[in-house]
């Protein structure tokens, strides 16, 4: 009887292990939209009309159109793009890409980056390394602090 109970426990733990590992392989983004198109042969998902994508770190990307290339974990957001992280930082632009593998967000055109603690960065074509939390741009940018001081 004890051997049978041991076997049941071993099977139970093996199942838990596989279920846990299966969840780790889940999709990188949870995407919702009014209209969703899937190109299975290219492994691409296209969302149109009030699209919202949420990644595993809780970062939320909202746009008029989102194209997600699943194989390379690359997301393209276009039209009224708003990216919010868990700390409350908000990035707004008209077009952005998110390279999930390298954890890099790149914006195209005018960009506003509002930090949760009141700081504001306005610029163009900004690259944001989300792991190191470093913003870069080769264009003229303006940084404003909470007291209204401006650095260009």
Indicate where each model-derived feature is located.
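Bacterial N-terminal signal peptides that target proteins for export
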Residues: 2-12
């Amino acid at each position: 009887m004890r051997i049978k109970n041991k076997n049941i426990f071993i099977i139970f733990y093996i199942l838990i292990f596989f279920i846990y590992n299966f969840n780790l392989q889940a999709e990188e983004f949870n995407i919702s939209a009014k209209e969703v198109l899937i190109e299975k042969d290219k492994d691409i998902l296209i969302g149109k009309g009030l699209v919202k994508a949420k990644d595993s770190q809780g970062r939320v990307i909202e746009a008029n159109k989102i194209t997600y290339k699943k194989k390379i974990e690359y997301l393209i957001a276009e039209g009224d793009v708003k990216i919010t992280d868990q700390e409350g930082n908000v990035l707004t632009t008209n077009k952005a890409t998110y390279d999930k593998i390298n954890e890099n967000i790149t914006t195209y055109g005018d960009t506003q980056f509002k930090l949760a603690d009141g700081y504001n960065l306005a610029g163009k074509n900004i690259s944001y390394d989300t792991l190191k939390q470093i913003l870069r741009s080769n264009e003229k940018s303006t940084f404003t602090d909470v007291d209204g001081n401006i650095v260009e």
